Protein backbone atom coordinates (compact mmCIF):
# COMPACT_ATOMS: atom_id res chain seq x y z
CA UNK A 1 0.00 0.00 0.00
CA UNK A 2 1.36 3.42 -0.96
CA UNK A 3 1.77 5.83 1.90
CA UNK A 4 0.74 9.45 2.13
CA UNK A 5 3.72 11.74 2.55
CA UNK A 6 3.32 14.20 5.43
CA UNK A 7 5.16 17.23 4.13
CA UNK A 8 7.33 19.69 6.02
CA UNK A 9 8.73 22.96 4.67
CA UNK A 10 10.51 23.18 1.31
CA UNK A 11 14.32 23.02 1.47
CA UNK A 12 14.72 26.76 0.84
CA UNK A 13 12.30 27.52 3.68
CA UNK A 14 14.19 25.57 6.37
CA UNK A 15 14.82 27.93 9.28
CA UNK A 16 17.95 27.55 11.40
CA UNK A 17 16.20 28.65 14.61
CA UNK A 18 13.41 26.11 14.09
CA UNK A 19 15.97 23.40 13.33
CA UNK A 20 17.97 24.23 16.47
CA UNK A 21 14.81 24.19 18.59
CA UNK A 22 13.93 20.77 17.15
CA UNK A 23 17.43 19.50 17.93
CA UNK A 24 17.31 20.97 21.44
CA UNK A 25 15.64 17.84 22.80
CA UNK A 26 17.87 14.84 23.55
CA UNK A 27 15.35 12.32 22.15
CA UNK A 28 14.99 14.18 18.86
CA UNK A 29 18.78 14.53 18.61
CA UNK A 30 19.08 10.79 19.21
CA UNK A 31 16.65 10.06 16.35
CA UNK A 32 18.52 12.45 14.05
CA UNK A 33 21.91 10.95 14.95
CA UNK A 34 20.63 7.44 14.15
CA UNK A 35 19.12 8.57 10.86
CA UNK A 36 22.24 10.52 9.87
CA UNK A 37 24.48 7.52 10.58
CA UNK A 38 22.58 5.47 7.98
CA UNK A 39 24.19 6.71 4.77
CA UNK A 40 21.65 4.75 2.68
CA UNK A 41 18.88 7.01 4.05
CA UNK A 42 16.50 4.08 4.19
CA UNK A 43 13.02 4.49 5.62
CA UNK A 44 12.61 3.48 9.26
CA UNK A 45 9.50 2.67 11.23
CA UNK A 46 8.65 4.96 14.12
CA UNK A 47 8.87 2.01 16.50
CA UNK A 48 12.41 1.11 15.36
CA UNK A 49 13.96 3.76 17.61
CA UNK A 50 14.80 2.73 21.18
CA UNK A 51 13.33 5.76 22.94
CA UNK A 52 12.40 5.54 26.65
CA UNK A 53 9.21 7.58 26.13
CA UNK A 54 5.55 6.84 25.44
CA UNK A 55 4.20 6.33 21.93
CA UNK A 56 2.28 9.60 22.18
CA UNK A 57 5.45 11.49 23.10
CA UNK A 58 7.32 9.83 20.23
CA UNK A 59 4.58 10.99 17.86
CA UNK A 60 5.04 14.54 19.14
CA UNK A 61 8.82 14.39 18.63
CA UNK A 62 8.49 13.07 15.07
CA UNK A 63 5.99 15.85 14.28
CA UNK A 64 8.43 18.49 15.59
CA UNK A 65 11.23 17.04 13.42
CA UNK A 66 8.93 16.97 10.37
CA UNK A 67 7.70 20.52 10.90
CA UNK A 68 11.33 21.67 11.20
CA UNK A 69 11.99 20.04 7.82
CA UNK A 70 14.46 17.46 9.11
CA UNK A 71 12.49 14.32 8.28
CA UNK A 72 9.72 13.12 6.02
CA UNK A 73 6.92 11.06 7.54
CA UNK A 74 5.06 8.57 5.39
CA UNK A 75 1.63 7.60 6.72
CA UNK A 76 0.58 4.06 5.80
CA UNK A 77 -2.59 4.16 7.89
CA UNK A 78 -1.62 1.68 10.58
CA UNK A 79 2.02 2.78 10.82
CA UNK A 80 4.36 5.62 9.84
CA UNK A 81 7.73 5.59 8.16
CA UNK A 82 10.49 8.11 8.83
CA UNK A 83 13.13 9.23 6.35
CA UNK A 84 15.93 11.78 6.81
CA UNK A 85 15.88 14.73 4.41
CA UNK A 86 19.67 14.56 4.05
CA UNK A 87 19.96 16.34 0.68
CA UNK A 88 17.72 19.22 1.78
CA UNK A 89 19.54 19.61 5.11
CA UNK A 90 22.99 19.53 3.50
CA UNK A 91 21.89 21.99 0.80
CA UNK A 92 20.53 24.50 3.31
CA UNK A 93 22.90 23.90 6.26
CA UNK A 94 26.09 22.20 5.02
CA UNK A 95 27.84 20.24 7.77
CA UNK A 96 24.92 20.24 10.21
CA UNK A 97 24.54 16.47 10.16
CA UNK A 98 28.28 16.05 10.78
CA UNK A 99 27.84 18.05 13.99
CA UNK A 100 25.40 15.41 15.20
CA UNK A 101 28.19 12.83 15.22
CA UNK A 102 27.46 11.32 11.85
CA UNK A 103 31.04 11.85 10.74
CA UNK A 104 32.54 14.45 8.44
CA UNK A 105 31.00 15.14 5.04
CA UNK A 106 32.57 12.94 2.35
CA UNK A 107 34.53 15.77 0.71
CA UNK A 108 36.18 16.83 4.01
CA UNK A 109 37.16 13.41 5.35
CA UNK A 110 40.75 13.21 6.68
CA UNK A 111 43.23 11.66 4.26
Predicted regions and their residues:
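A general structural signal for short secondary-structure boundary/capping elements
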Residues: 65-68, 79-82, 98-100
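Amphipathic alpha-helical dimerization/coiled-coil segments
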Residues: 1-17, 33-38, 85-111
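Conserved acidic functional residues
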Residues: 25, 61, 94
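Generic low-complexity, intrinsically disordered sequence content enriched
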Residues: 27, 69, 100-104
Amino acid sequence: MAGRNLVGPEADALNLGTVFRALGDEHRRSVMTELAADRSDSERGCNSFDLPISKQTQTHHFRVLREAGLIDEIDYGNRKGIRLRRADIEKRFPGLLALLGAGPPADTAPR
